[in-house]
């Protein structure tokens, strides 16, 4: 399987939640870039989770940092913000199949 990739997380309370699986050697770099883009990382020692909460997104992972869960807090997240986060992950949208001509 090629990294990065994502899977929809239907068990989360927020409707648009995805788990992003990234290359382990990029995890620290990705979290530094997320912190620069979205705000400070909070470490929750009691549950071994690190999290960034912004006005529109929550980004969360265990202390090893991978996979990264991305939750949209609001249904109308700016597509440019999602594009910047996807660029940090190195993620591109899954290709869609075009109907034959």
Regions found by a protein language model. Give the residues of each.
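Structured alpha/beta or helical-core interaction and ligand-binding surfaces enriched in interleaved
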Residues: 1-101
């Amino acid at each position: 399987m090629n990294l990065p990739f994502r899977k929809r997380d239907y068990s989360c309370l927020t409707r648009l939640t995805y788990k992003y699986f990234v290359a382990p050697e990029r995890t620290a770099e990705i979290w530094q870039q997320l912190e620069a883009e979205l705000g400070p990382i909070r470490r929750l020692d009691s549950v071994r989770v690190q999290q960034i909460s912004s006005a529109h997104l929550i980004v969360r992972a265990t202390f090893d940092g991978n996979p990264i869960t991305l939750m949209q807090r609001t249904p109308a997240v700016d597509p440019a913000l999602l594009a910047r986060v996807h660029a940090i992950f190195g993620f591109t949208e899954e290709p869609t199949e075009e109907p034959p001509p």
